[in-house]
Design a protein with these regions (language model features):
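Positively charged n-region of N-terminal signal peptides that target proteins for export
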Residues: 1-6
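Bacterial N-terminal signal peptides
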Residues: 7-19
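Secreted/extracellular ectodomain signature
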Residues: 22-151
Length: 151
């Protein structure tokens, strides 16, 4: 009798586990691109709050979400190693996002323009990837089904 009860509990646990994953995988994937184009710490923090809230919401539902924050124009300061007012929060968010993911993309057009104006190379934080053009990256992500958010 104990063995039957144990087997039933294991079966229920497996059904619950696979039921949640099947539900998450059978639906539309959750993907969001967040635009940051202002050198404003409040806007940058709001973008990071949006990303964190998305991670927490879908984690509670046992679902994954992919978030990409694209910074260009004056917003590139968010991802500059020398001027970012939020680089500690970015490091923290990147560390806690698994199994979902938060990706940070820095516009190379903006980076090159800033380097030309400032007369020296600009270092981007290690959590960010340089993309050719921020606006193009946003457009391509939307074409792939990402939802668009501008804080």
């Amino acid at each position: 009798m104990k063995m039957v009860f144990h087997s039933v509990l294991v079966a229920i646990g497996i059904a619950f586990l696979f039921g949640n994953f099947a539900n998450a995988e059978s639906g539309k994937p959750h993907r969001v691109v967040i635009q940051v184009d202002q050198n404003d710490a409040d806007v940058m923090n709001l973008a990071l709050n949006n990303a964190r809230n998305l991670l927490d919401y879908y984690r509670d539902k046992h679902e994954d979400v992919d978030v990409e924050i694209v910074a260009y124009g004056p917003g590139l300061h968010m991802l500059r190693d020398d001027t970012s007012p939020v680089k500690d929060r970015i490091r923290e968010l990147a560390a806690v996002s698994f199994p979902s993911k938060v990706v940070f993309s820095a516009c190379n057009n903006t980076k090159q323009g800033m380097e030309k104006r400032e007369g020296h190379p600009i270092t981007i934080i290690p959590q960010a990837t340089i993309v050719p053009a921020g606006v193009v990256r946003i457009m391509e992500l939307e074409e792939q089904g990402y939802s668009y958010v501008k804080p």
